[in-house]
């Protein structure tokens, strides 16, 4: 069976003032992919993620499979009203995403159970640890039942235990059939989670390979230099 493209980005270029953030990037996201966008700071990872999600204007073409229309989710860092409870943050987010009012309570309960936060549902979001806040962000995304999930550095600034919890949730989402595109500075995380690795340098895609191939001895050019770099192998 041929892979089903959910999202196609063609010839996308993005400029912020004097900075060329993306240069003629083309990328296809297939159903079931878990794509890790990797590269040095300023390589274009976050800009590409936002172009894929339709959050930044670009000069190219973005085509979304009709079956995925309206079923996307983006995990932001600290996307909460901190004075509201975990429960109310989740209900508001699901309502804004278009979940029918009659389904809000059940959907919120299911999402909290999925990420292990049921016992904290009445606690203010500001009282959560960093790892718990990220699990709340994942609950908000999971509750929308997205075909496509976008994550920007989902474990940045988390301690090792919290990172493992978040990674376990993402592995579970992928097993459930969710298609995921994630930017990360952590090559170890990309190797553990992703099915494809896309390496960016200077706003251009320099490599787009299955994970096993990307981390093999066959890798060439700038991508190989990146994987061998001192910072690249600071596996967290």
What does each of the following model-derived ranges do?
Residues 160-162:
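Helix N-cap at the start of a conserved alpha-helix in ABC-type nucleotide-binding domains
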Residues 124-128, 132:
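Conserved ABC ATPase signature
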């Amino acid at each position: 069976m041929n892979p089903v493209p959910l999202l196609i980005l063609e010839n996308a270029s993005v400029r912020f003032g004097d900075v060329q953030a993306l240069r003629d990037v083309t990328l296809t996201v297939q159903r079931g992919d878990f794509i890790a966008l990797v590269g040095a700071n300023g390589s274009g990872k976050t800009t590409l993620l936002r172009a894929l999600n339709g959050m930044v204007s670009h000069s190219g073409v973005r085509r979304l499979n009709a079956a995925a229309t309206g079923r996307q989710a983006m995990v932001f860092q600290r996307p909460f009203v901190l004075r509201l409870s975990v429960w109310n943050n989740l209900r508001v987010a699901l309502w804004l995403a278009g979940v029918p009012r009659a389904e809000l309570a059940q959907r919120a309960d299911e999402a909290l159970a999925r990420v292990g936060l049921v016992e904290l549902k009445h606690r203010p979001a500001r009282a959560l640890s960093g790892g718990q806040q990220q699990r709340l962000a994942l609950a908000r995304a999971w509750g929308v039942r997205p075909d496509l999930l976008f994550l920007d550095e989902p474990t940045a600034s988390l301690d090792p235990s919290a990172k493992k919890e978040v990674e376990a949730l993402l592995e579970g989402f992928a097993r459930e059939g969710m298609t995921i595109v994630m930017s990360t500075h952590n090559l170890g995380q990309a190797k553990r989670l992703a099915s494809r690795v896309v390496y960016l340098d200077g706003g251009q895609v320099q490599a787009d390979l299955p994970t096993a191939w990307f981390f093999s001895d066959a890798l060439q050019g700038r991508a190989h230099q990146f994987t061998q770099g001192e910072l690249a192998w600071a596996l967290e």
